[in-house]
Amino acid sequence: MNKGKEILLGHGERIRIMSAFSISYPTLRRALRFETDTELARKIRHTAISEYGGMERAN
């Protein structure tokens, strides 16, 4: 489902999100790169932007 977008986050923020959602790095990476569009992926993207300062970038 890659729309040519991604959410940019620092390494520390990625670690905190993985811990908060109890997910693996590949799950986080696929969500932030818009490769998946599940309910969990949408929650991860929303949290990354609203709580961890993530920036959405179009490729």
Region locations from a protein language model:
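Short helix->loop/beta-hairpin flanking segments within DNA-binding domains
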Residues: 1-4
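Short amphipathic helical patch at the helix-1/turn junction of helix-turn-helix
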Residues: 8-9, 19
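Short Lys/Arg-enriched helix C-cap and helix-to-coil transition segments
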Residues: 9, 39-59
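Residue-level signal for the short linker/turn that defines the boundary of a DNA-recognition helix
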Residues: 11-12, 23
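DNA-recognition alpha helix
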Residues: 13-17, 51
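Short alpha-helical "recognition helix" segments of helix-turn-helix
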Residues: 16-21, 28
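Recognition helix of helix-turn-helix/homeodomain-like DNA-binding domains
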Residues: 25-36
